[in-house]
A protein has these predicted regions:
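Signature of N-terminal electron-transfer/Fe-S-associated modules in redox systems
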Residues: 1-155
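Flexible, low-hydrophobicity surface segments
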Residues: 145-207
Length: 207
């Protein structure tokens, strides 16, 4: 068995097991998304000793004695700051990739609270987003850095719903902090699973 720390607690995992499988199936940590399964998209990003790392290609034998942190394990302060910044910047659309973006942002801000735009872009190079075009995500990271750097309180947002008022998405915080459910995150007692069975003979005539 391999022993390591997960969000501050001691855990152990079988040797040779993929970290993402353990985090999602055993720990119900759904911020770690299975987007590609081959280390390309960054939706499964976690912190390993403070470094952004893709959990879908990380085997348990590589994490002995290390500290693993997911979005669920971030401090309340960090959660509030990232939730505000990503929502305020309009950086959330479908939201699937955002927890991974938050982890990459956190890894950067552990190094510096005064990053340049180029440093933000470099930090997010391992994360793919098909919705936003990255500009608003980069803005969100810079905004989060500023709040943390200046030790400012997170502004409280009140929306009256009047015409012309700037309003945030009602589901933004849930998506940023991985509290919103996607289909693969759902678990129901007695759930039946299925998958598409592809024919080995695409031109075969079935009679």
């Amino acid at each position: 068995m391999v022993k390591f720390k997960l969000n501050g607690r001691d855990v152990e995992i079988e040797e040779g097991r993929t970290l993402i499988n353990y985090l999602r199936e055993e720990c119900d940590l759904t911020s770690v998304k299975n987007g590609c399964g081959e280390g390309a998209c960054g939706a499964c990003m976690v912190l390993v000793d403070g470094k952004a790392t893709k959990a879908c290609i990380l085997k348990s034998d590589k994490i002995e004695g290390k500290e693993i942190q997911t979005v669920e394990g971030l401090s309340d302060r960090d959660k509030k700051v990232f939730a505000y910044a990503f929502s305020k910047a309009g950086a959330v659309q479908c939201g699937f990739c955002i927890p991974g973006m938050v982890i990459s942002a956190k890894a950067l801000l552990l190094k510096t609270l005064n990053p340049t735009l180029d440093e933000v872009k470099k930090a997010l190079m391992g994360n793919i987003c098909r919705c936003t075009g990255y500009v608003k995500i980069e803005k969100a990271v810079l905004m989060a850095a500023e709040i943390l750097r200046e030790n400012r309180d997170v502004p409280t947002v009140f929306c009256k719903g009047i015409v012309g008022e700037e309003m945030g998405r009602i589901d933004a915080e849930d998506k940023i902090l991985a509290e919103g459910e996607y289909v693969d995150d759902m678990k129901i007692n007695g759930m039946i699973y299925g998958f598409a069975l592809r024919s080995k003979y695409p031109r075969a005539l079935v009679k």
